[in-house]
């Protein structure tokens, strides 16, 4: 099955390398997963862009992947359902680049403190300083969160300070809906 995932990933990489000037320009792959068992497999491709993604862009990517699969001299042994979609609300961020799209939005972040303990914070993403190749692979990459105020605060309370978190300490960051 791993061989199939690698082959399909190559098709997807080929499709995504040729999006300039198309509906899918600026779209990038977040994750690829082949799910199910033989005869009932589904290829799940999550895509995103720095400005958000439209249904038409997902459809374009899906059609191009299907074309690549059909062009192959060595077709996959069975039919595979293809599902191309964007990461939904509540889906953990998987790539550093995704932080840009969530600037100003509420995130629930689980992270490691400098002492190694796990901690959580809910806050608004104020800044994403992503250094390095592919927007954030460097140890210097950080995000800045403004903590969400829980309940009513006393009138004379000091304002909460922004928190800087290195990406290397983030275990999981999930965009949250604000009600």
Curated annotation (Swiss-Prot):
It comes from the Bacteria. It is found in: Cytoplasm. The lineage of its organism: Bacteria, Pseudomonadati, Chlorobiota, Chlorobiia, Chlorobiales. Keywords: Cytoplasm, Ribosome biogenesis. InterPro entries: Ribosome_maturation_RimP (IPR003728), RimP_N (IPR028989), RimP_N_sf (IPR035956). One of its GO terms (biological process) is ribosomal small subunit assembly. The gene is rimP. This is Ribosome maturation factor RimP. PANTHER family: RIBOSOME MATURATION FACTOR RIMP. Gene3D superfamilies: RimP-like superfamily, N-terminal. Required for maturation of 30S ribosomal subunits. One of its GO terms (cellular component) is cytosol. NCBIfam families: PRK14641.1 (NF011234). It holds the Pfam family RimP_N. Belongs to the RimP family.
């Amino acid at each position: 099955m791993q061989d199939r995932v690698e082959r399909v990933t190559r098709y997807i990489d080929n499709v995504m390398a040729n999006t300039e000037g198309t509906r899918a320009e600026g779209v990038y792959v977040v994750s690829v997963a082949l799910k199910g068992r033989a005869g009932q497999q589904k290829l799940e491709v999550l895509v995103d862009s720095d400005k958000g993604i439209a249904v038409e862009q997902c459809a374009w990517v899906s059609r191009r992947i299907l074309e690549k699969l059909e062009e192959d001299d060595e077709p996959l042994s069975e039919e595979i359902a293809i599902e191309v979609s964007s990461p939904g609300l509540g889906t953990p961020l998987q790539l550093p680049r995704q932080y840009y799209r969530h600037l100003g939005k509420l995130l629930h972040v689980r992270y490691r403190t400098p002492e190694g303990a796990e901690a959580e914070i809910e806050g608004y993403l104020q800044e994403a300083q992503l250094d390095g190749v592919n927007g954030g692979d460097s140890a210097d990459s950080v995000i800045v969160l403004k903590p969400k105020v829980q309940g009513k605060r006393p009138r004379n309370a000091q304002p909460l300070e922004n928190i800087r978190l290195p990406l290397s300490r983030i275990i999981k960051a999930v965009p949250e809906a604000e009600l």
